[in-house]
Amino acid sequence: MNSLFASTARGLEELLKTELENLGAVECQVVQGGVHFKGDTRLVYQSLMWSRLASRIMLPLGECKVYSDLDLYLGVQAINWTEMFNPGATFAVHFSGLNDTIRNSQYGAMKVKDAIVDAFTRKNLPRPNVDRDAPDIRVNVWLHKETASIALDLSGDGLHLRGYRDRAGIAPIKETLAAAIVMRSGWQPGTPLLDPMCGSGTLLIEAAMLATDRAPGLHRGRWGFSGWAQHDEAIWQEVKAEAQTRARKGLAEYSSHFYGSDSDARVIQRARTNARLAGIAELITFEVKDVAQLTNPLLKGPYGTVLSNPPYGERLDSEPALIALHSLLGRIMKNQFGGWNLSLFSASPDLLSCLQLRADKQYKAKNGPLDCVQKNYHVAESTPDSKPAMVAEDYANRLRKNLKKFEKWARQEGIECYRLYDADLPEYNVAVDRYSDWVVVQEYAPPKTIDAHKARQRLFDIIAATISVLGIAPNKLVLKTRERQKGKNQYQKLGEKGEFLEVTEYNAHLWVNLTDYLDTGLFLDHRIARRMLGQMSKGKDFLNLFSYTGSATVHAGLGGARSTTTVDMSRTYLEWAERNLRLNGLTGRAHRLIQADCLAWLREANEQFDLIFIDPPTFSNSKRMEDAFDVQRDHLALMKDLKRLLRAGGTIMFSNNKRGFRMDLDGLAKLGLKAQEITQKTLSQDFARNRQIHNCWLITAA
């Protein structure tokens, strides 16, 4: 009897143990990452040929303590290598693990290689050659703390390399994991199986091989036992012949069918090639089809299983499309696949909850470094009186109501950008802004007292409901997470896409960027203030301080301002402002753009203006500003400097976003100024629910 070890992916050990026992293995013992077992020579070959779950089958040769590199060398040399393979065979060493002595795996592999070579040369035998790429013998050494475990890898290449798949493409799952997913899916061979996001077809091919009794090792060309001195070619040929006979019989007798689809024509072509190489192409129908076009191929036929490994995303901007995808799949399953089973393998359990289905079973597994879950569902058959499940129903109803109200109003006003929803319902704490045919959903960061998983799930529900109610394509929704406005949050860079969208606001054309920054380049709550500036600016010299992207300057210029001066510390935003001006035909010397610390520029400027707009940050301590700025503390000093630049009869429009801001009216009076609050006049319908989003004042000479 041989003592053997089969390695596998984490989470699949018990499944592998059952498989090995069914093959005839005895004394199976599960450990993390694999199964120890015993079997005769025939079982060695059968486990290699038939195991769908093992990553490698290894023959342990011994262990040694490693307190020095000499210990490793002597421990390896103590094994009788000349009984393991002939000197004419090539070999390679795979070394993993480190300790205080062996701190580099390459060094460890070199010491093992030296010990093996010396074992031959000391017996006056020819020196065996090393072949790292295609060796006849693979030696595996695993160092854990002070113990090195040495084994012969009888697999050669990993057993997931079945021989049917083109390795050039990126594979989301290995064949061994795919086989485990099939086994855990609840699918019964002989019933239909469908994968609507099949990629290169691995799940379907593994299922078809399982169903037709086709050994996973049947198409492999190389094995790790070819140079093994104890290899029994006669027994191997018997095992191989039996596998070929069973495969022919299984294919001839199998009557059910497999269905795969994917939106990418290139991967479908690869899937067809893989199925042909696996010998089961006649059983699988592959189609180029998006999930949105998914239909039940057997409406009147037997119930089957939908099995898939859907995409998931780690980037925030990919989530809306994935949420929409999972929500759509859930709806299609309920509408067209009543009575079927569904099994999905995913690295994002939160996305699976978008299906709006209750899982009957779930399994955990590792896909490389990723923690994954597989959930199995039974889709109930629909009845005539069954109603479709609503996602975030309260939120969806409010959004639908707001849409009906604001869409008509915005059209009449001549604006394309407006707020549709602003945390109207406390449990759905987001803002939803429309920019032409795009939508930006901003999630206000939830309090730490809110369970993070629940908050994330609610956000997913919001996105699914938003896409459904507004009828937009998922790629037209942009998701952002932010805290309530603080300091210079609007200057935070998020991306580098550089994609700008042209929008209209009354008679102005403006560029917005929905993806690269926390804000979009257009503060929607200041829309009426900008229109007022346009109406007040005819024939006047206009100054815009803390100008951001210059949208207020555009309105002033279109309103007939004699000149405009736009000042901001950011070169990025000044260039943006210049693009906005150019888009509206406002070019030339009459329209100046100045990059400067606004407060320092204000103290030094000696020009005169008829109309000044200033919208400073609530607080700023930018390294490029000379002093920290607090709008509540410093607004009077600001007005003192502004008064010096204000021409007789001129007006300052002063706005800020500080909640609870108090204007120092007495201090203004001492400066010879007076203030009129116009906040309510500057709040349009879409911001009427949030009366503290900004405050706005007109300041003139007393």
UniProtKB/Swiss-Prot annotation:
Gene Ontology MF annotations: 23S rRNA (guanine(2445)-N(2))-methyltransferase activity; RNA binding; rRNA (guanine-N7-)-methyltransferase activity
Sequence intervals crossing the membrane: none
Broad class of the protein's primary localization: cytoplasm
UniProt keyword Nucleotide-binding, yes or no: no
Subcellular location: Cytoplasm
Cross-referenced InterPro entries: 23SrRNA_methyltr_KL, DNA_methylase_N6_adenine_CS, RlmKL-like_Mtase, RlmKL-like_Mtase_CS, RlmL_1st, SAM-dep_methyl-trfase, SAM-dependent_MTases_sf, THUMP_dom
Domain THUMP: start-end pairs: 43-154
Keyword Transcription regulation set for record: no
Keyword list, A-Z: Cytoplasm, Methyltransferase, RNA-binding, rRNA processing, S-adenosyl-L-methionine, Transferase
GO cellular component: cytoplasm
Stated family: Belongs to the methyltransferase superfamily. RlmKL family.
Name of the protein in question: Ribosomal RNA large subunit methyltransferase K/L
Gene: rlmL
